[in-house]
Design a protein with these regions (language model features):
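Beta-strand-turn-beta hairpins that frame and shape the catalytic cleft
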Residues: 1-4, 12, 106-111, 122-138, ...
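N-terminal, active-site-proximal structural segment of metallo-dependent hydrolase catalytic domains
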Residues: 1-74, 81-89, 244-247
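Active-site flanking residues adjacent to catalytic metal/cofactor-binding acidic residues
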Residues: 6, 53, 139, 169-171
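Active-site environment of divalent metal-dependent phosphoester hydrolases
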Residues: 11-12, 57-60, 87-90, 144-147, ...
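Short aromatic-enriched loop/helix-cap "lid" or pocket-rim segments at secondary-structure transitions
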Residues: 13-19, 64-65, 91-94, 126, ...
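Structured beta-strand-rich core segments of catalytic domains in phosphoester-bond hydrolases
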Residues: 54-133, 225-228
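Metal-dependent phosphoester-hydrolase catalytic domains
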Residues: 110, 115-117, 130, 157-167, ...
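Alpha-helical scaffold elements lining the catalytic groove of polysaccharide deacetylases
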Residues: 146-157
């Protein structure tokens, strides 16, 4: 099976123009050409599971286009998504922001999906996708170090409850890379698919390993890549794996 993880930055693009006329102004405007390029890249990868971080589910920014559903329809996948903020968050009432989400696109038969929430941080969503042989969690952790540590503790509690082999994927915002999440991985019985610590951010000249695909025992990683794709500020991760037969 193949898992593709990509923080697409709401298909707002990159480059100097993103910060004009003011720093960060690009977050207010999506680009259909960028969305098309992202979709074409994802289609070409022929992934069984796609985890999307920072996807717009139909705000005025995208002309009411739900990016998760659009990409899913183009590649023939099932989609599930949810706003990444807590259900009681004031962000649920803010235009554009309330449509900022994370999403799974999946080709295999989905046994179940669950939305969990961290107790701390602005970005709180955890999506759990249960397939026949594996559970996959998708996260976007806090920018604040202390909040990330609390979130990792909660994520550990979810992972160890799983009855199947586990994959945890997402933008961890771990500015120290694997060193920052080492104890979480050891406690949860996870290891990084990115054995060489390849950086994924920023996309133009990657220097930091912010994005991770972590796997548990029972999963064999057969290939891992960070493609040179620059449609977002992050580069995507592509992981080929198979679930070992139970002994």
């Amino acid at each position: 099976m193949r898992l593709l993880l990509y923080n697409i930055r709401y298909a707002t693009g990159t480059g100097a123009a993103f910060h004009l006329p003011l720093p960060g102004a690009g977050y207010l405007r999506s680009n259909r050409k960028v969305l098309t390029r992202i979709t074409e890249f994802i289609r070409a990868e022929q992934s069984d599971i796609v985890g999307l971080i920072e996807v717009d589910t139909g705000s005025v920014r995208t002309g009411m286009v739900n990016q998760a559903e659009h990409i899913a329809s183009q590649i023939g996948h099932y989609s599930t998504y949810e706003c990444k903020y807590g259900r009681s968050s004031l962000n649920q009432f803010v235009p554009i922001v309330r449509k900022q989400a994370n999403a799974f696109l999946s080709a295999p038969h989905v046994r179940g999906e669950r939305f969990h929430y961290f107790d701390i941080g602005i970005k709180r969503l955890i999506i759990e996708l249960e397939l026949e042989d594996v559970c996959v969690f998708l996260v976007h952790l806090s920018l604040k170090f202390r909040q990330r540590q609390y979130q990792l503790r909660s994520l550990h509690d979810l992972v160890v409850q799983a009855k199947k082999p586990v994959i945890v994927a997402g933008d961890f915002n771990a500015f120290w890379g694997t060193h920052e999440i080492y104890l979480f991985m050891r406690a949860s019985g996870l290891r990084s698919a990115n054995t060489h610590g390849l950086p994924s951010f920023p996309a133009r000249v990657p220097r930091i390993e912010l994005d991770f695909i972590l796997v548990s025992a029972g999963i064999e990683v057969t290939d891992f890549r960070v493609p040179d794709v620059r449609y977002s500020d992050h580069r995507p991760l592509v992981c080929d794996f198979h679930v070992k037969a139970a002994a």
